[in-house]
């Protein structure tokens, strides 16, 4: 008998070599699978994630699932057991027993990524692993206007880093919000979409920064999208500022459907 568990987790990614299991490297998937192996006295339980965050990238709302053998453990006990075995840079925040047709990756309706960018002139030693850094002049209003050109369904080849294995580069961006956190002297970017290509959020942030810094024309992203050429945006924002914030398994709420008003 197998019981499928859906679990939401947060992790500080700066000491992990990404989410996905890699030989002889510290990864999020490997850490969780090691704990499950101890719980089952040596059985390999494969953990499926909603996506593969890169080295140094963080998560507030990563979702995983796995099939646990033997007697069903109540969800409240499973989360206690796993959290007791996690290092201090991982915590599980929710646990549910779900039907076997639920899949952490293939049941997704959308994802929400957040990017935090420090505007401090010098790199803050307490932020260096948790924000990007851009100590230059930025026009936020221009960035907000330019971001509207990314909304909707497009081929995002120009915003996909080489090395990605997915051939279909068409994605839908539902929502983009760019705000200033005056207290922290940071800009916060929020992106909600049907899915995101390899490094896509970080490349979009880099392009918007070029517009905000007046190194790229206001509506140049329309041309960039049409070009379908990665060389059109050569910069990629630092991974330290990126957070997988939330994964949607129900329809995207209407308040996040800016694409419907284009």
UniProtKB/Swiss-Prot annotation:
Pfam hit, one: PseudoU_synth_1
What is the organism of origin for this protein? Lactobacillus acidophilus (strain ATCC 700396 / NCK56 / N2 / NCFM)
> What catalytic activity does the UniProt entry give for this protein?
uridine(38/39/40) in tRNA = pseudouridine(38/39/40) in tRNA
Q: What is its EC number?
A: 5.4.99.12
Enumerate the UniProt keywords alphabetically.
Isomerase, tRNA processing
Q: Which residues form a coiled coil?
A: none
GO molecular function terms here? RNA binding; tRNA pseudouridine(38-40) synthase activity
NCBIfam families in UniProt: hisT_truA
Gene (name only): truA
* CDD domains reported for this sequence: PseudoU_synth_EcTruA (cd02570)
Q: What is this protein called?
A: tRNA pseudouridine synthase A
């Amino acid at each position: 008998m197998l019981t499928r568990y859906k679990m939401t987790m947060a992790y500080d990614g700066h000491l992990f070599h990404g989410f996905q299991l890699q030989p002889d490297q510290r990864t999020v998937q490997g850490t969780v699978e090691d704990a499950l192996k101890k719980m089952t006295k040596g059985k390999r339980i494969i953990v499926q994630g909603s996506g593969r965050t890169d080295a140094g990238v963080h998560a507030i709302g990563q979702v995983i699932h796995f099939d646990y053998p033997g007697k069903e453990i109540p969800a409240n006990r499973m989360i206690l057991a796993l959290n007791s075995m996690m290092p201090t840079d991982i915590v599980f925040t929710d646990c549910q027993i779900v039907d076997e047709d639920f899949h952490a990756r293939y049941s997704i309706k959308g994802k929400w990524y957040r990017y935090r960018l420090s505007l401090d002139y010098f790199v803050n030693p307490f932020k260096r692993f948790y924000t990007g850094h851009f100590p230059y002049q930025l026009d936020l209003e221009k960035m907000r206007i330019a971001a509207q050109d990314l909304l909707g369904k497009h081929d995002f080849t120009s915003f996909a880093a080489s090395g990605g294995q997915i051939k279909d580069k068409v994605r839908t961006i539902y929502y983009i919000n760019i705000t200033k956190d005056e207290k922290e002297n940071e800009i916060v970017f929020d992106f909600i979409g049907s899915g995101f290509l390899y490094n896509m959020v970080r490349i979009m942030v880099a392009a918007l920064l070029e517009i905000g810094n007046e190194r790229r024309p206001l509506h140049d992203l329309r041309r960039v999208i049409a070009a379908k050429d990665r060389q059109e945006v050569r910069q990629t924002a630092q991974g330290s500022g990126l957070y997988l914030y939330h994964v949607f398994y129900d329809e995207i709420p209407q308040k996040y459907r800016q694409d419907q008003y284009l």
